[in-house]
A protein has these predicted regions:
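A conserved helix-loop-strand patch within extracytoplasmic ligand-binding domains
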Residues: 1-18
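Hydrophobic, Leu/Ile/Phe/Ala-enriched alpha-helical segments that form helix-helix packing faces
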Residues: 3-6, 32-33, 172
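Surface-exposed patches in mature extracellular/periplasmic domains of secreted proteins
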Residues: 11, 42-45, 67, 152-156, ...
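Flexible, solvent-exposed loop/hinge segments that line or gate ligand/substrate-binding clefts
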Residues: 17-18, 28, 32-37, 41-151
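Glycine-rich anion/phosphate-binding loop at the beta-strand->alpha-helix junction
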Residues: 22
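C-terminal functional modules
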Residues: 127-128, 137-183
Length: 183
């Protein structure tokens, strides 16, 4: 529907998806676009660094672009982005080259809008179940750290040169969210 707004010289009349680095992420963007009948071309640039450079350049020039990344990611802490949403997540074990890229009969974009991935705080279950660690366990159960906050902290560390500790302290000083985590 909006392909003309995302078309470039290299994609002609098709819209452009800045595709994921195929070798590292194994996402098969063009196959997914074709299965869904989306008239876009996946332009795969080889690395995450190249993907981000292309996206940042488009953003800086105020050119429309389409890409996807996980969250939290520093790109979202650095740039104001708009999510477009994807079809509901559905597992699709047959979306493989060996199975000729079948779409499981779903008619949807396999393995997209991935199921929510919750950051887990790794700990020894036996240790955390012991009575002397009850407060620590209560803390981790209450902890909810927004992706947007994490993305901004990633920018402060990666671009602005803060240490992780400094970025955390800055966040703590400007937010009261963490106080609700305390037992």
């Amino acid at each position: 529907k909006f392909k003309d707004q995302f078309a470039t010289v290299e994609t002609g009349s098709k819209g452009r998806l800045i595709g994921c680095p195929e070798a590292g992420w194994n996402c098969h963007d063009q196959k997914r676009l074709d299965i869904m009948g989306i008239d876009f071309e996946a332009v795969e640039l080889g690395t995450e660094v190249a993907l981000l450079a292309e996206a940042q350049g488009s953003y800086d020039r105020q050119e429309p672009f389409l890409m996807y990344l996980w969250e939290p990611h520093f790109f979202f802490g650095k740039n104001e982005m708009v999510g477009i949403g994807l079809p509901p997540h559905q597992a699709c074990d047959s979306f493989t080259e060996a199975n000729n890229w079948q779409d499981c009969g779903m008619g949807s974009w396999p393995a997209s809008n991935w199921a929510k991935d919750y950051t887990m705080n790794y700990m020894n279950p036996e240790t955390m179940q012991s009575p002397e660690n009850a407060e620590a366990l209560a803390f981790f159960k209450k902890m909810k750290f927004a992706n947007a906050d994490q993305a901004k902290m990633l920018v402060r560390v990666g671009d602005d040169g803060l240490s992780v500790e400094e970025a955390v302290q800055e966040w703590k000083d400007s937010s009261n969210d963490w106080q609700a985590w305390l037992p």
